[in-house]
Structure formats: C-alpha cells, structure tokens
C-alpha cells in the first residue's frame, strides 16, 4: 500500500518489539545496568533512568491464552493486566531487576500484587513496589505524590542497588529523557503535513521502542531515523482516504494502528496510554527548585488519564482531544477503550457523545481486546467510519461549489 522508501531501522525496531526482553535490554544488563519494569505514565519515566538504571514499559507481545491469569484475576478485569500476569507466570519477566507499580487502577494493582504473590521473578534482589497516585492536583496531593516517589522508588533503588538518586543524578536522567522526547516530538510534528513522510504505524513503532529500550542504546537509532525522515520524500499522492486521531486507553500493539491504516485512515495523533501524548513532552526544570517535585508536577499537569475526576481535568481531556485533532488536521476521532477498563469505560461512553454533539467531530467509539490487530469486526467498523468521513468531505466540497 505504501510507496514511501522503507526506513532503515524499521525492521530492527519491529524485532525489538517482539519480546519485552529484547536485544538492547540484554545488552544493557550485560553491561551492568539495572532494568526496572513499569506499566503506567504515573511512574515518572525519567526517575527510572537515574544512575545506571533503565526503564522498560511492560508489554506482552503475541499474547495467546490468558486462562491462568483469568483464574487468578477473573474474566472481568482488563486484558492488559491479565496478559502481564500470564506472561509473568510463563517466566517472561525473569529479566527484570525490579517492578515499579502504581495503584492507578484496581486491576493493575491486582496485577502487581500477583507479581509478588506468585513470585514471577526469582532474582534474590527483585522487588515490587506500589505507589499511590492522586485523583486531582492540589498542594497536598502533590506533596503526597512526591513522598511516594521518593520513599517507594528512589529510596528503594538506593537501598537495594546503591543507585545515586541525588538531585544532580535526576537532572542528568531528565536531560537524556528530554532528548528522546524532542526527537519523538519532532517526528510527530511531521504528521501535520497534508502528505506526511511518516505513517501512523511507523510512528507507533518508533515511539514504542523509545518506551521499551534503554535510552542510551536506542538514542543513536532515533537520531539517525529523524535525520532520515527529514530527507524522506512523501508519496506524490497520499494512499490514505481520511485522517483520524485516536484517543483512549492502553495500546501497545502497533498492529492495531496498522489495521486502521489498512482501512484507509491515516493515524495522525496518538492520545492514548503508550502514545506520545502524554509521555513525550519535554520536562522543563528550574535550577532553583527540587527536581523531583518539578517532575511530579509535570506528570500530574500533563496526565490525560481518566483516573483524574476533577472538573478541570475532565475538561482538559476533551480540550486536548479537540486541539490535537485540529492541529493534526484529523477528519474524525476514534475513541477506544480496552474491554473492562473502568476509567475509560465511563470516559469513552460520555466523551464520544460530547465530542460529537458539542465539538462537532465525527466519532467512532469502540471497545476492544488487548491484541486486536486481526479483528475482522473492528476492521469492518473502521472501514465504515472511513467511508462516512469521505461522504462528509464530498458533501462539504459540494456545499462550497
């Protein structure tokens, strides 16, 4: 379908996403680095890359049966949480040195509990830590959040592994984190073009490897890919029939983006968990303020998680979806939700109507399984949505004539 010249490292990036314990993770650990697993944006990524630590945002690629995890967690819990437990029981996370969990939702909390109870990692120094996450932004919730990160994350890393978690070390980690964010953001800006030099699938793959690989080892590939994209020539005519923004819960499977684009809809914005919004915004640090507190405030302010129930955050999520769809010239919005996701179940049901009725956006609202890249039913719904967007465009053009 695509005539764009293949990106040099795309196949390698896809290979890195085949397993959580990928080639670069193994290389970093062989060099003595400490691997920290996490699942949620509410664990500040930069903090997990302090000193000789590196973060891996956990996925369970090619998940098949999750029957054993379902036995422990019931079939009314989100499949992402169950897939992680299933992969852990299979031994797929033995490479981790620690698991940094957050009580962002009850299902992920249950998953982290099972990492401990079922002893899915046999390393003597392995530990699972849990952090409580706020529902709204106030001085006291920020104070609590900072304490949680200091006590349950930074102090534990120092106690168990002797990691330097000083203010200077945190700032160094943020500098490296910001370079990754700047590169991904610059690639993202390219998606605003009428005929972009990067597809949504390619961007999804590149963004995912930035979450799942050691920063110092993936950065050279990201730098080279950015330089390559700057010289890449777009197709003379775009092969896509529509442009869409995706909003919603966790998507770590780029095959879902591939499915949507295979239906003719170019994905131009990724406002979902594991996406670039939020997650790939540069963290601006002031020299005269505590770095940890600034990072925690940054995460709280930029979070688009449906966990936040304050009126201003609910409005922020809608305004962000509207802003991104406009900035990236989307013609419609796909609101998606992992099946049994409590927070996004409520958010999707309400916001999908509000974005249509009050903001005027064509909206496709879907709930989906964890791995949905080959769903015939979903493909049919996306194809119908693309056709509806084409019809709207035709009517709009006829109205101007």
Segment roles from a protein language model:
Residues 30, 41-42, 47-59, 248-313, ...:
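Redox- and metal-dependent alpha/beta enzyme cores, enriched for Fe-S-associated oxidoreductases
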Residues 1-34, 146, 155-282, 310:
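A charged, amphipathic alpha-helical module
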Residues 8, 15-29, 37-46, 65-69, ...:
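Metallocofactor- and cofactor-centric catalytic cores in central/energy metabolism, strongly enriched
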Residues 83-156:
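Acidic/His-rich segments in extracytoplasmic proteins that coordinate ligands and/or metal ions
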Residues 59-65, 70, 133-134, 271-276, ...:
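Short, acidic/turn-prone active-site loops that include or flank metal/cofactor-
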Residues 72-90, 309-322:
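Glycine-rich, highly charged phosphate/nucleotide-binding loops
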């Amino acid at each position: 379908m695509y005539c764009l010249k293949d990106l040099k490292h795309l196949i390698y990036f896809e290979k890195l996403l085949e397993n959580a314990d990928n080639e670069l993770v193994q290389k970093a650990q062989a060099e003595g680095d400490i691997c920290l697993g996490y699942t949620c944006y509410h664990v500040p990524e930069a903090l997990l890359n302090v000193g000789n630590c590196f973060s891996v945002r956990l996925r369970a690629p090619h998940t098949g049966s999750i029957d054993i995890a379902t036995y422990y967690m019931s079939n009314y819990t989100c499949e992402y949480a169950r897939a992680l437990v299933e992969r852990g029981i299979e031994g797929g996370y033995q490479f981790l040195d620690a698991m940094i969990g957050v009580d962002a939702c009850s299902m992920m909390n249950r998953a982290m509990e099972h990492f401990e109870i079922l002893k899915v990692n046999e390393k003597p120094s392995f530990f699972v830590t849990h952090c409580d996450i706020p529902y709204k932004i106030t001085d006291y919730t920020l104070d609590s959040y900072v304490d949680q990160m200091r006590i349950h994350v930074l102090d534990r890393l120092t106690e168990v592994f002797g990691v330097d978690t000083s203010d200077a070390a945190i700032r160094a980690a943020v500098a490296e984190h910001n370079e990754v964010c700047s590169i991904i953001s610059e690639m993202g800006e390219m998606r605003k073009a009428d005929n972009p030099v990067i597809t949504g699938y390619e961007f999804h793959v590149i963004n995912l490897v930035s979450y799942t690989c050691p920063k110092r080892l993936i950065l050279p590939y990201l730098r080279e890919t950015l330089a390559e994209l700057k010289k890449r020539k777009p197709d003379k005519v775009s092969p896509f029939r529509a442009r869409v923004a995706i909003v919603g819960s966790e998507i770590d499977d780029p095959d879902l983006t591939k499915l949507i684009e295979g239906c003719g809809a170019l994905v131009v914005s990724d406002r979902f968990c594991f996406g670039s919004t939020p997650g790939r915004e540069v963290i601006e640090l002031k020299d005269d303020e505590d770095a940890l507190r600034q990072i925690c405030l940054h995460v709280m302010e930029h979070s688009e998680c449906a966990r936040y129930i304050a009126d201003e955050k609910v409005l922020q999520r809608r305004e962000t979806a509207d802003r991104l769809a406009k900035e990236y010239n989307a013609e419609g919005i796909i609101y998606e939700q992992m099946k049994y996701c409590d927070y996004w179940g409520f958010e999707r049901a309400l916001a999908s109507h509000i974005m249509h009725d009050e903001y005027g956006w064509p909206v496709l609202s879907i709930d989906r399984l964890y791995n949905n890249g080959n769903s015939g039913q979903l493909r049919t719904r996306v194809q119908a949505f693309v056709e509806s967007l084409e019809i709207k465009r035709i009517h709009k053009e006829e109205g101007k004539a």
